[in-house]
Amino acid sequence: IFEALAISDIKAAADLLGDVYHATGGRDGFVSLEVNPHLATDTGGTIEEARKLFGAVNRPNLMIKVPATPAGIPAIKTLISEGINVNVTLIFSRGVYESVREAYISGLENLSNIGGNLSKVSSVASFFVSRVDTAIDGSLEESDQHLIGKSAIANAKAAYADFQRTFSSGRYQTLQNDGARVQRPLWASTSVKNPDFSDVMYVDSLIGLDTVNTMPDVTLDAYKDHGNPNLTLVRDLDDALSHLNMIEKAGVNMDELTDKLLVDGLKAFSDSYDKLIKNISEKRATLLVEQQSSD
């Protein structure tokens, strides 16, 4: 029941955004549908479900959402090599992001080798922002309070520099000449959790070419009211890298923290999925009882 409802809703959403997709030559107007989060440790299961969902929705502006887990990375490569659009989600660290970019590039190369149309494949790499600050700020000692609220933006700016390096390389240029699109960074979780900072801090600081920003209504409304649209993402990269070094010197283990954020993110996805399935099951049972009572 859930799958049928989800596919129906996603088809409608994709059709609604179809004009945007076609008007931008397939650059924008995408809708994402995630695989069952319980498949996050199952490469084969992720690939199988992604193929099924992509075929069932049958819309060119659909992205299949796959988490950036050790099992998800090879699935991403396979899906891209089959021409399936992918939204890689739950990226927190630059190390994982490097694996994500490699999976995308390798997938495009495989698709090119079999004569596939690279211009029809799109992908975004969803880098989660505010949760990084929440995790790191809570780990800082009293003497390091001056570092609060800066780590997520520094992490994202460094990741964007990684993006620029990868997608200006000769390896990628060969693919681009055959019609390939860059895998755009997508900034997710951009609402500010700390009331001591501007409510548009993350949006203002992460504006750059070839990026996407998803935000809740409250953040969007705040940005419309007092946001400052400038190309900020490429500014102060040296300061960002210096901050990340200071975080390490302060005793914060970034890899350990971001690994935990991934685990916590997967649990949140799975819990939401399970709750939805339970609600549908309970509603179905109630309707069946009502139907039997009326017969």
Residue map of PLM features:
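Alpha-helical scaffolding segments of alpha/beta enzyme cores, especially the outer helices
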Residues: 12, 16-19, 48, 52-55, ...
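Flexible, acidic glycine-rich loops studded with aromatic residues
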Residues: 179-285
